[in-house]
Amino acid sequence: MKSLIYIFLLCVSTITAQTKYEQGMRKAFELWGSEKTEEASNLFERISTAEKDKWLPHYYVAQIAIIKNWKDFDNREEVTLKANLDKAQEYLNNASSITTGNAYVTYLQAQLYTVWVAHDGMKYGMKYAGKIGQMYQEIIDKHPDNPLFIAAKASWDMGSARYFGKPVTPYCEELQRAIKLFATFKPETEFHPKGSVTPYLETVKQCNE
């Protein structure tokens, strides 16, 4: 009888913990969707501290820190950019320690490196450009129909082509394929990254120029 009571209490505790996690994540996304970015990031941080085995809160803290740098990018200050990316790297490292070989963590690491390259191509291009392309190819090989990964690689390839004065058309087919896949893509769970087709609808216009 005591064993049954213990099992019951354990199950109740697990369900309660999952509910708190889910409620917290939903609230964080709600804040983010309302453009309360700092509040969302702070909540993701608190969740990551409470939920030691969950990689997604760490992922979103890192993602928010990365995205911050694209706002008013032309007027960026390296001190601020570095602080944001250092924080992002810390949380990506945390996520990696929880989930080894996770394609989404690899994707976000490539996004982080992209900010460095965009900030100073002469300084960081040689260091990160090759890694970025390799990372994207690696995750696409594992997940060939994930539109987030396909679009990111195609967009990166197009940017690289423009930088070197080459045509972007060889990458348009993959970008267009990703845009179509976004319409039917279903993330693994409610909280998994799903991306947005919106920025790529702008990028694909370059294919008609």
Give the residues covered by each predicted segment:
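"A position-specific structural signal for the A-helix of alpha-solenoid helical repeats
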Residues: 26, 60, 67, 108, ...
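Short coil/linker segments at helix-helix boundaries
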Residues: 38-41, 64-94, 111-135, 155-199
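Start-of-domain marker
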Residues: 18-66
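Bacterial Sec-dependent N-terminal signal peptides
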Residues: 1-24
